[in-house]
């Protein structure tokens, strides 16, 4: 008995459906060859290694997003999906992203780290600590110079000058950045003095390239944030940047300025809240007085108490005294809170490092580290001096 045969088209369609469903996404490493830029804007090429080769296509829209200069011999990591092209009876790779080998491997390492931490539950919302509504002290982990510290200080001064600011200066990029950031997080969690322990921490840096932000994708920094007993707000780069530190932190802010806004309440809003509370107390007090007055009127109009007028006088005196005392207590609370806010604003102004530098002080650095003791400097050592209006270099003499 002769079985019914499939047509070439039927078999090819079956292969196409099976293959494309099995490989909706692939990531493959290889060498480019036969790179051809078509007039349509599409790029046709072959991805190969010592054992095999795969034809590949990069559509015009994908090519426009890639900064790579495609050339024969370039080692790349390609991402995409497999597709069967029936007219030629072959399969090809439809590329959705292309990375040079070094960049691609770094991306893969980052993806593996994110997958590892996600599996460990480090990103889970259930483990994230709430940010205190009214923090007394705020620890800032960032560079001591530049726009970040100025922007955050301006926000704190405007919104909530009562907060005490604690700065741990760190390197935010470079070889020592990871060690510096981890050391700062550990310091604030176990400071030598109780008054150095903040209620909330902000880890921040300005925008930059992916290489500049690399320290905030390091597992050691992620672990230090995860282990922190103090709530951590992460503000790394711009709103479009997302680092591992952002994902582990208890709260992610798009920019350092936004982090400062999320860390503290608005002073004007607090004052409005106080005014509302005062008004509510006043209304409550007036209601109590009105109720008491009605009782007094009822009593004085009754036959039994119509004669002892002196009792009515006593009630009125007590009511007047109660009203006076309640108004005085409310006024004192409002006055005390205003004095606290004013004092806090003065303390915040005193913490401004530029103000200190203008009084004749300078920051001393050696090899990008802050010098805190004369004993640590040897003769003829090269040092950096940061003044309020610029920087100079100097050498140490005996």
UniProtKB/Swiss-Prot annotation:
<comment type="similarity">
    <text>Belongs to the XseA family.</text>
</comment>
<dbReference type="Pfam" id="PF02601">
    <property type="entry name" value="Exonuc_VII_L"/>
</dbReference>
<dbReference type="GO" id="GO:0003676">
    <property type="term" value="F:nucleic acid binding"/>
</dbReference>
<comment type="function">
    <text>Bidirectionally degrades single-stranded DNA into large acid-insoluble oligonucleotides, which are then degraded further into small acid-soluble oligonucleotides.</text>
</comment>
<dbReference type="InterPro" id="IPR025824">
    <property type="entry name" value="OB-fold_nuc-bd_dom"/>
</dbReference>
<comment type="subunit">
    <text>Heterooligomer composed of large and small subunits.</text>
</comment>
<dbReference type="GO" id="GO:0009318">
    <property type="term" value="C:exodeoxyribonuclease VII complex"/>
</dbReference>
<dbReference type="Pfam" id="PF13742">
    <property type="entry name" value="tRNA_anti_2"/>
</dbReference>
<dbReference type="GO" id="GO:0008855">
    <property type="term" value="F:exodeoxyribonuclease VII activity"/>
</dbReference>
<keyword id="KW-0963">Cytoplasm</keyword>
<keyword id="KW-0540">Nuclease</keyword>
<keyword id="KW-0378">Hydrolase</keyword>
<keyword id="KW-0269">Exonuclease</keyword>
<dbReference type="InterPro" id="IPR020579">
    <property type="entry name" value="Exonuc_VII_lsu_C"/>
</dbReference>
<dbReference type="GO" id="GO:0006308">
    <property type="term" value="P:DNA catabolic process"/>
</dbReference>
<dbReference type="GO" id="GO:0005737">
    <property type="term" value="C:cytoplasm"/>
</dbReference>
<protein>
    <recommendedName>
        <fullName>Exodeoxyribonuclease 7 large subunit</fullName>
        <ecNumber>3.1.11.6</ecNumber>
    </recommendedName>
</protein>
<dbReference type="InterPro" id="IPR003753">
    <property type="entry name" value="Exonuc_VII_L"/>
</dbReference>
